[in-house]
């Protein structure tokens, strides 16, 4: 399988305005895969003898987990991207290199995204969670629900209100780069070069043993563990380079609307089309002022150019997000659940179903399609304006916010229904 999925971005002051960190990700996955947006509350786990069931394996539970909102392929336990109640955001990428990908079932990179969010209340603590679990349980297993074998190593972009970390892996070996200002992006290639702020203790020795590094020249993680020529990486016409250019084009004035437009960019390939396409997108505003709420926008539908970014804010007593939650199936409580179905179940959630009907109209590019897209943009613009007001006025109406994402999906579905039935 060729590296052909996902782009994750972060922008920090002074590249942004109003002392905000902006996080964004497109999740590029098989075109027939449904991605859901789900919420899990914080929890206390008294019985630590009871193991936690991830996608393929069981691991030790911890005494406490944080509330999380996740955008995830509906068939698995983990997540492609998400955030927790402490303002930590994580997105992961598939990466390939010289180290062989393990076919044995272990933790998926997507499991590690969720585990980092549930167990880390800062970006660096989430990184610690991921690398500790990587050492203990390893990474591996098929990342596709179908018969296609799709396995890879992972890179992660982890951000909070103060900083971001890039974590890139090759099997159990890893390197991490701290990002405290400016812009950074990751795509489907190793990108940490000589600026290595943390690393696996045996990473360099292993590279020497394999003959990938002579131990004399300056150590470059990407050059050592990757197939790619890192000297060409920043000038090649790939998505990593194009994403870097788009971030730098707006450097100094980046807002969450800027990040939305980057995720919608089709000429660069960041908004992907084809057998692999952008199945869901996320943008988060992480104010450095801890008195302000973090705001997370999700599409829950494919193609961000023809989707609505809808806000979510962590407040007490949030109920499950029914319009973006996929159906569950009887056999899905056991580890290795995907192997128990002879064919793929219908995992389309209510928003996804209506959006698919809307796409049929939008594909025709008629006057009706233009009207519907205009209404979608109008709704989104109103939501953006409302969220900006929350940040500027420093006031939250908790009784309204508790059902914010649900109400937004209701409004979006109403647009689709009115145009599909007319």
UniProtKB/Swiss-Prot annotation:
Catalytic residues (UniProt): 6
GO molecular function, one term: cysteine-type exopeptidase activity
Propeptide segments, given as residue ranges: 1-5
Modified residue annotations for Glyoxylic acid (Cys): 6
Keyword Nucleotide-binding tagged: no
Keywords of the record: Pyruvate
A Pfam family it matches: Peptidase_C69
Name by which UniProt lists this protein: Secernin-3
